[in-house]
């Protein structure tokens, strides 16, 4: 039988706790993201995005930079007025979090799957794909 060094056990424990903490931190960043998105908070959204972020909108074949995204907030603010956004994390591992999000606009709703890559406390990549034209699958 092999003896496991207490140092190895300690190192493994610290690594696991840091991964759990990072996953929880990513969840908090995602929660902040949707809260800021709902009220079109340009300052908070800008703070959450890394300067070199790439935001891929699969359905329309567009990749936005941080500057592109922030510039679109005025238009988004009009679209999101009176809306609700519900989201739940489907999985989170290795800095990547996949979210199912229902965008419930006053006249329609849509179900999206969004994947965020978080590093150093900021969103460094995001991919958004439509799942359904309504939120019945949420």
What are the language-model segments listed below?
Residues 1-7:
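Positively charged n-region of N-terminal signal peptides that target proteins for export
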Residues 7-17:
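Bacterial N-terminal signal peptides
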Residues 23-41:
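Short, aromatic-enriched amphipathic alpha-helices that serve as compact interaction elements
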Residues 40-52, 56:
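Short, well-ordered alpha-helical segments enriched in acidic and aromatic residues
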Residues 49, 59, 102-105, 130:
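A mature extracytoplasmic/lumenal domain signature
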Residues 54-64, 79:
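A short gly/proline-enriched turn/hairpin at secondary-structure junctions
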Residues 67-113:
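Surface-exposed, charged secondary-structure patches
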Residues 109-138:
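Short beta-strand edge/turn micro-motifs at domain boundaries
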